[in-house]
Structures are given as C-alpha cells and as structure tokens.
From Swiss-Prot:
GO terms for molecular function: penicillin binding; peptidoglycan L,D-transpeptidase activity; serine-type D-Ala-D-Ala carboxypeptidase activity. Inhibited by mecillinam and benzylpenicillin. Inhibited by diazabicyclooctane (DBO)-based avibactam and CPD4, with IC(50) values of 0.59 uM and 0.01 uM, respectively. Belongs to the transpeptidase family. MrdA subfamily. The gene is mrdA. The chain crosses the membrane at residues 22-42. This is Peptidoglycan D,D-transpeptidase MrdA. GO terms for biological process: cell wall organization; peptidoglycan biosynthetic process; proteolysis; regulation of cell shape; response to antibiotic.
Length: 633
C-alpha cells in the first residue's frame, strides 16, 4: 500500500480538479447568464408584447350597441321608435357541435331553414367570439321554452334588443324610410368611410328615406365592456365598461295628421302630393301612393313579399314625390311668363290673338290650343287665367330653347332640389346639347314650342314643382325644401338652417305679382280654368292646373278618356297656395292618368280646406274622367 501511494501525484490531481471545477463553474455561470438574459428579454424587453398576448387570451372587448334616435313629427308625435325584442344568439366558439345545436333548437324555438341560412351567412363575415343571431323576434312562448331548455345549450342565450318600429305603417314609408339588416355592401361602404368599428354591435342600418339620410345623426356611438374570460371562453368578471352614446332624436317639419289625411284622399290612385310652408321651405306633407309597410323590411322581408312589391304594376316602391318624373304641363306657365318678362321678350302690355292654334313661322306646322275655338285677344294675365297654349307657344318661340332652359334651370328644373332625401331624380330640362347626346340629332325650332307649355322633352318631379312654386311665392327668393326641423343635442333643439342661394331674377321687378295675379284669376275669376273649385272658399287661393299627355293625339282628334286605356289617360297636375295675400301653405299635386276618384281641383280644395279651416271631410264625389279632362288645364 505504501508503495502504491508513493507513486500518486497529488499536486497534479488537485490541479486537474481545480480545472474541472473551474470549467464546470464557468459552464454553470454561462448557463445562468443565458437564463438571466432570457428572463430579462421575457420580463423586461418583451414584457408589453407578452402581456398583450396574455390579455388577448384572457380579456375580451364586447361591443355594446347604442340606442337609435327617435324620429318625431313637428308636434312631437313619434314616427319611428324602438321596441324591445328578443332574439336567440350563439357564440360558435363556445359550442362543441354547431350543427347538432342548430338541429336541437328547431323544436325549441321553431327554427327554420331560412333562419339557419341567415345564421351561416352572418357567421361567415363575423369575428371570433362574436355572438351571432340565430332567430330574431322571438315570441313569449319561444322565450319561455328556451328558458326551460337552456341547460342543454351552452354558448346559446336569449338577448333583448331595441328594434325599430314604424307605428303608422305605409303613411310615412316614402319619407321616413326604414332600417334593415346590414349587408355586404353596407359593410364595404362603412369600411371605406372608416365607420365600420362603430357598427360592431349594430345589426341594422338606415336603408331609405330619413333613416338613411340622417344615419350618422340617428345611430349614436358604440360602447364596450372589457371582460375577463377563462380558457373555455366563459366570462368570469367585468373589468371595465364604456357606455354607448345614444343617437340624437330628430324632429321633422311633417304634420302627421295632414300626411294621413292626404293619404286617405289619394287611396286607390297613383299619385303624389307635396305640401310646404313657403316661408321656411319646410315640408308639411310628402305623400306618394300606393305605398307599403316599412316594418316588413326591418327583420328582413321574405322573397315572396319582396317579389310582390317589385312586380306590382302600380310600383309602390317608387317615391313619386321625388322620383316620379312627368311633363310639368301648364303648371310652369307662370314661371315662363316671369322669365319672358325678365328677359324682355314680352312686356306687361304684350297681346296675341288666339284662333285656337299657333303656326310655326316658315312652316305649315300648326300647334293646337286645348280650346278648339280659341281664346281671342290675350295678354299675360288672361293667358294664365285661361291657360292659353298659343300665347306660350309664341313666348317659347321668341325666347328660344337656350334662354328658356337657362331660366327654367333657375327655377330648379333639371336639378336636384336639395331636399334631405337620397331618393331623388333631377328630371330633364332639355337643351340642344342634351338632345344631341341623347338622340344624336340637332335641336329644331319645332322642339322648342311644346316646352313653352311644359311638354315635349321636359320632365320634372313634384318636389321640383313645389320648389318652383315657392320661388314664385317669394318673388324670386329661393327656399330649399327640407324635412328636418331640428336635432336634439344635449337637451337643446338645434334648428335646421336654410342654405343661402342666389335669388332668381329681380325680386323687385313686379313681374312676380303679375304671374301670381294670373294664378289668382285661375281660382277666382269667372274665366279661370279652376274657378269652380276655389271661388267659393272663405279664404283666397291662387292655383294653376295642368294636363300632361301620355300619348299624342292625331290632327283634329278629340281626347276622350272613356275610349282610352286607363294607363294612357292624361296625368292631372295642380299647384296652389293660400291665403293669397299672405301665403302660409303651398301644394303641388300629380294624379297619374287622372287618378281613381275626384278631380285634381276637388282634392286640392279639400287639402287646403283641411289646412286652413280644419275640414276633415274625405267623403268626396267621384267624377267622370272625361268631364274632368275637359275642365283641368
């Protein structure tokens, strides 16, 4: 033993041990450094990143839909309001088998194939952890049945929502419009406008009328709640809530009672009536018949119901007051007279003898007057009172289409009126350039003549006729027709402000009074074409009627409504205002093909009596269309 120990080199072994220990220590130190560096990177450098990831798994933002603003009429009557409805919703991430769950729900809440198809479509475009509607507008029985069976459906729940409701149905559809489910086009538009985030919890959006035009005002600001969820996606607790901001309530210039009254008068007719206050431009009534119930669209109209509306020959989907285009006919004669006087084409003393026709100079072409035997010697006033066509044929010929189109454009024809509805057409005020572009033909002198009496290529909407009438009433001062009266903001009413537009012509020329006096004669003097309707009124009315031909008559052919198909009969138009010396109301009316009941003058008188006298009589006599055709010009 002693011999073996004498050969061991303890110094070398000690040095080797020290080296190994040093290497091990350095290795441990290096590994510890790497660990510390990684801990530093995780805890310090990337702390925010990992905290965010953790919170994204743990914390969810749940959007809260704002309450949509209420729409009121001028007297504070709600025209569009919100009602609580219940719908069943599913969060697919919380459901083990979506299809089995849907099948099981069929017997519980009467789920249909259409409901399931709508759910799948909505799911395809929704974000994760979004609650998706499965069936809307549940009945009390369906809610109760689900409550009893809820334990069978984790991830499915019934929620209450505010749903739009229109209590007056078809009476206001073409004005108020409606909201309906947000579709792909809406999503694309909202995204392009940078507004999509504000609709995270909203299912409906304004599609038509006031609901569409003032969507940004009515919708409000979406809120949200911050909640903590577990690994199964179930909410553990609420961390924070930012309440939504309700949309603003708005008040319209409309008078609901007047709107309903006029709709009753027009029942059965294809017609439109616009009633305004010429002092402000506020629209008191805007009626288009036939109409339809907007509530059909709120929950999503069925294909059958929509096809019925779309294929209805009476076109109830069209707002005739703003989208219907018709020859304005003789209703424009007062404006043509003011234009010709202002342009120096005629004077107050200009006269013309009317034998019952007017002949185009240098041609054998004759243009007939509605009165076969003629009106005799005419001046400006008498030509308006008797609605003499020949006088205005001559005026149109002398003015020429360029000046005539320019002046009628000042009265708003051929342009949008500015009314706060997106559903509006501009009609057509013909020009040389328009005809060349449309028909690839030049403008002939013969084209100008019928324009002088509101015929030919000229088309206009009832709202344009209303705006032109207000310009005349106000001696050339322009009032833009509008439906918004005020918006409720912070407990205050913020009124709508009339935009400034340059006046038409010289407001002090006196020509306006001359034209209005002619309209006064139409309604009050024995030779006036509408004398029989208005002369007996206890207040003074000024009016101008018109007849728009749907098809042309042959030479020497007499119009007989009884021998013509209903759809080919003349349209009947009328504009009027009252009281004459201090106008408070202006009315424009169109009865397609003469309407289905009383004559246009009878209806106009009844509307004015209702406004001025409170007369609510709607039991009016039906009139012979052939007789009415001979009287309304």
């Amino acid at each position: 033993m002693k011999l073996q120990n004498s050969f061991r080199d303890y110094t070398a072994e000690s040095a080797l041990f020290v080296r190994r220990a040093l290497v091990a220590f350095l290795g441990i130190l290096l590994l510890t450094g790497v660990l510390i560096a990684n801990l530093y990177n995780l805890q310090i450098v990337r702390f925010t990143d990992y905290q965010t990831r953790s919170n994204e798994n743990r914390i969810k933002l749940v959007p809260i839909a704002p309450s949509r603003g209420i729409i009121y009429d001028r007297n504070g009557i709600p025209l569009a309001l919100n009602r609580t409805i219940y719908q069943i919703e599913m969060m697919p991430e919380k459901v083990d088998n979506v299809q089995q769950t849907l099948d099981a729900l069929r017997s519980v809440v009467d789920l249909t194939d259409d409901d399931i198809a709508a759910f799948r479509k909505e799911r395809a475009r929704s974000h994760r952890f979004t609650s998706i509607p499965v069936k809307t507008n549940l009945t009390e029985v369906q809610v109760a049945r689900f409550a009893v069976n809820q334990y069978r459906f984790p991830g499915v729940e019934v929620k209450g929502y505010k749903r739009r409701y229109y209590p007056y149905g078809s009476a206001l559809t073409h004005v108020i419009g409606y909201v309906s489910k947000i579709n792909d086009k809406d999503v694309e538009r909202l995204n392009n406008d940078g507004k999509l985030a504000n609709y995270a919890a909203t299912h409906d959006i304004g599609k038509l009328g006031i609901e569409r035009y003032y969507e940004d005002v009515l919708h409000g600001q979406t809120g949200y709640e911050e909640v903590e969820v577990n690994n199964r996606g179930r909410v553990i607790r609420q961390l924070k809530e930012v309440p939504p901001q309700a949309g603003h309530d708005i008040y319209l210039t409309l008078d609901l009672k007047l709107q309903q009254y006029i709709e009753t008068l027009l029942a059965g007719s294809r017609a439109a009536v616009v009633v305004t206050d010429p002092r402000t431009g506020g629209v008191l009534a805007l009626v288009s018949t036939p109409s339809y119930d907007p509530n059909l669209f709120v929950d999503g109209i069925s294909s059958k119901d929509y096809s019925a509306l779309l294929n209805d020959p009476n076109t109830p989907l069209v707002n005739r007051a703003t989208q219907g285009v018709y020859p304005p006919a003789s209703t424009v004669k007062p404006y043509v007279a003011v234009s010709a006087l202002s342009a120096g084409v005629i004077t107050r003393n200009t006269t013309l003898f009317d034998p019952g026709w007017w002949q185009l100079p240098g041609s054998e072409k004759r243009y007939r007057d509605w009165k076969k035997w003629g009106h005799g010697r005419l001046n400006v006033t008498r030509s308006l009172e008797e609605s003499a066509d020949t006088f205005f044929y001559q005026v149109a010929y002398d003015m020429g289409i360029d000046r005539l189109s320019e002046w009628m454009g000042k009265f708003g024809y051929g342009h949008y009126t500015g009314i706060d509805l997106a559903e509006e057409r501009s009609g057509n005020m013909p020009t040389r350039e328009w005809k060349q572009k449309r028909f690839k033909k030049p403008w002939y002198q013969g084209d100008t003549i019928p324009v002088g009496i509101g015929q030919g290529y000229w088309t206009a909407t009832p709202i344009q006729m209303s705006k032109a009438l207000m310009i005349l009433i106000n001696d050339g001062i322009v009032k833009v027709p509008h439906l918004l009266m005020s918006t409720a903001e912070d407990g205050k009413q913020v009124p709508w402000v009339q935009p400034h537009e340059p006046p038409v012509g010289d407001i002090h020329s006196g020509y306006w009074e001359l034209a209005k006096d002619g309209m006064y004669g139409v309604a009050n003097r024995p030779n006036g074409t509408a004398h029989k309707y208005f002369a007996s009124a206890p207040y003074k009315i000024a009016a101008k009627s018109g007849t728009a031909q749907v098809f042309g008559l042959k030479a020497n052919e007499t119009y007989n409504a009884h021998k013509i198909a209903e759809r080919l009969r003349d349209h009947k138009l009328m504009t009027a205002f009252a009281p004459y010396n201090n106008p408070q109301v202006a009315v424009a009316m169109i009865l397609e093909n003469g309407g289905a009941g009383p004559a246009v003058g009878t209806l106009m008188r009844q509307i004015l009596d209702h406004i001025m006298l409170g007369d609510n009589n709607t039991d009016l006599p039906a009139e012979n269309p052939a007789v009415a055709a001979a009287e309304d010009h």
